[in-house]
């Protein structure tokens, strides 16, 4: 948990500094009009959507009103399941990863999250589930190790979410100890214990492996932000230039 908060603080600082360097007023306007949703990684335990903060612990989803930032107010606590790991916002939905399934909640009523469905991978029995989504597809990394309850496969799972009430796993890719993930345009970035994997998702349900970026680092999570990829590693935060989305170029490392 200590490393999660360190990443959150460093990411906030980096994103703020990147935003301050933007001189194009249209870019600034687009950022400001992004629904008030905070930037966060796929392994986060909290996210901000509009005027609400959503957090998860091992079993529950909690909703806080941020109408008064000085005094957040707990509005609701919703039982989700067991061994909850991550939370990720997508439009008016929350994707909540656990060691057994991905839960999908509607936040059409932001103070009363409603469970819509669950997504289960037939490939592994127990795992850690960072998850992201866009349009009609969701991607989850399913990591099987002692921390996540054992199992036999670590994979990148691809879900068809066109019917949000009945998500279906379309395909998967075998990986070695995957962690967080993020996407920019038609590229998907997956943090792993052995490097940063880059995939083309031009065909969204069929990720095509492009390359692995190895910097002698154990990658935990990534946040694409414009033409910059913010990567959280075991030894600090690395910034990559992703002007060429399929070929991240090292910029600097923040210890």
What residues fall within each predicted segment?
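Feature marking well-ordered beta-strand scaffolds used for ligand recognition
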Residues: 20-255
């Amino acid at each position: 948990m200590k490393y999660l908060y360190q990443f959150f603080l460093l990411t906030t600082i980096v994103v703020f500094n990147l935003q301050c360097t933007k001189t194009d007023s249209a870019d600034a306007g687009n950022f400001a009009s992004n629904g008030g949703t905070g930037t966060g990684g796929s392994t986060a335990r909290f996210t901000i959507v509009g005027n609400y903060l959503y957090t998860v612990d091992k079993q529950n989803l909690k909703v806080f009103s941020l109408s008064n930032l000085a005094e957040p107010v707990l509005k609701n606590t919703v039982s989700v399941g067991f061994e909850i790991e991550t939370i990720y916002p997508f439009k008016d939905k929350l994707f909540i990863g656990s060691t057994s399934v991905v839960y999908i909640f509607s936040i059409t009523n932001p103070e009363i999250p409603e469970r819509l469905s669950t997504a289960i991978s037939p490939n592994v029995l127990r795992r850690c589930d960072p998850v992201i989504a866009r349009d009609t597809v969701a991607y989850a990394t399913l990591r099987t190790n002692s921390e996540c309850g054992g199992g036999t496969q670590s994979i990148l799972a691809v879900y068809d979410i066109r019917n949000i009430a009945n998500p279906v796993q379309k395909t998967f890719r075998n990986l070695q100890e995957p962690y967080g993930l993020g996407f920019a345009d038609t590229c998907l970035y997956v943090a792993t214990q052995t490097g940063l994997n880059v995939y083309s998702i031009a065909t969204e349900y069929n990720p095509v492996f492009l390359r692995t970026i190895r910097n002698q680092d154990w990658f935990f999570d990534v946040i694409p932000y414009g033409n910059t990829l913010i990567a959280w590693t075991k030894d600090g935060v690395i910034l990559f230039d992703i002007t060429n989305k399929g070929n991240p170029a090292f910029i600097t490392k923040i210890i």
